[in-house]
Amino acid sequence: MKDWLDEIHWNADGLVPAIAQDHETGRVLMMAWMNREALALTASENRAIYWSRSRGKLWRKGEESGHVQKLHELRLDCDADVVILMVEQVGGIACHTGRESCFYRVYENGDWKVVDPVLKDPDAIYEHAGHQHE
């Protein structure tokens, strides 16, 4: 029997881009990377677990902030080289900047304009964890 993880086209570093979307609204919340272990754990634990390239280890989304992403559905694109996680974003904040989405800037007239508010000060989110913003 073929392993479902073998169907994924991992990049040269053994990673695949993972896009998290709100399962109700479809809004793109963030993009991160997953290795084979992260994706397998995400599927088995029904929560988003990524691979932190800067830390070189698994990153359980929400382990420091409390902003866990509960998995509702996992999708693979037609080229098998990108996954989408349809998630429930606990606390409504996906971005380390304290915003709902990491995609909070819009290109307008030759510049990037911030269009989404900070819902919670990042220092208040990470004050107890000594977090390095990823």
UniProtKB/Swiss-Prot annotation:
GO BP, sorted A to Z: L-histidine biosynthetic process
Protein's pathway: Amino-acid biosynthesis; L-histidine biosynthesis; L-histidine from 5-phospho-alpha-D-ribose 1-diphosphate: step 3/9
Annotated positions binding Mg(2+): D77, D79, D81
Cofactor: how and how many bound: Binds 1 Mg(2+) ion per subunit. Binds 1 zinc ion per subunit.
Catalytic activities: 1-(5-phospho-beta-D-ribosyl)-5'-AMP + H2O = 1-(5-phospho-beta-D-ribosyl)-5-[(5-phospho-beta-D-ribosylamino)methylideneamino]imidazole-4-carboxamide
Any GO molecular function: phosphoribosyl-AMP cyclohydrolase activity
Entry keywords, A to Z: Amino-acid biosynthesis, Cytoplasm, Histidine biosynthesis, Hydrolase, Magnesium, Metal-binding, Zinc
Alphabetical list of Pfam families matching this protein: PRA-CH
Subunit structure: Homodimer.
Matching HAMAP family: HisI (MF_01021)
PANTHER family in UniProt: HISTIDINE BIOSYNTHESIS BIFUNCTIONAL PROTEIN (PTHR42945), HISTIDINE BIOSYNTHESIS BIFUNCTIONAL PROTEIN HIS7 (PTHR42945:SF1)
Protein name: Phosphoribosyl-AMP cyclohydrolase
